Amino acid sequence: METIDKIKQQINENPILLYMKGSPKFPSCGFSARAVEAIIQCQVPFGYVDILTNPDIRSELPKFANWPTFPQLWVEGELIGGCDIILEMFQKGELHTLLKETATKHG
């Protein structure tokens, strides 16, 4: 399977998906750690892809998404953004609302 097809499949199969460095329990960078903590606090199920163990995705996703950095949060097939946007949405209560609505819809 081509890397782009793999990315599309991951995004389609996971209504809430975080591309990050490391895993939710063991994030490998500060940005991923802060982003995943905000998502965990929303108490919804979400998928993740560790880009450190998937170098093909690490190199192709920024081109596909037109977003150069990680982490990247995808919700219902749309890129929401990286760490700064995730944290800003979390502080405003918008992240919780978006993720709860998405989880309920796909629950």
From Swiss-Prot:
Could you cite one Gene Ontology molecular function of this protein? disulfide oxidoreductase activity
Binding residues annotated for [2Fe-2S] cluster, in chain numbering: C29
- UniProt protein name: Glutaredoxin 4
Keyword Transmembrane helix annotated = no
Offer a single GO CC term for the protein.
cytoplasm
Name its cellular compartments: Cytoplasm
- Domain Glutaredoxin residue range list: 4-106
Q: Which UniProt keywords apply?
A: 2Fe-2S, Cytoplasm, Iron, Iron-sulfur, Metal-binding, Redox-active center
- Role, per record: Monothiol glutaredoxin involved in the biogenesis of iron-sulfur clusters.
Q: Which residues bind glutathione?
A: K21, R58, F70, C83, D84
Q: Which Pfam families match?
A: Glutaredoxin
Q: Which family does it belong to?
A: Belongs to the glutaredoxin family. Monothiol subfamily.
Origin organism of this chain? Haemophilus ducreyi (strain 35000HP / ATCC 700724)
Q: Which NCBIfam families does the record match to this protein?
A: Grx4 family monothiol glutaredoxin
Subunit composition and interactions: Homodimer.
Q: Which gene encodes it?
A: grxD
What's the chief localization of this chain?
Answer: cytoplasm
Mind telling me which PROSITE patterns this protein's record contains? GLUTAREDOXIN_2
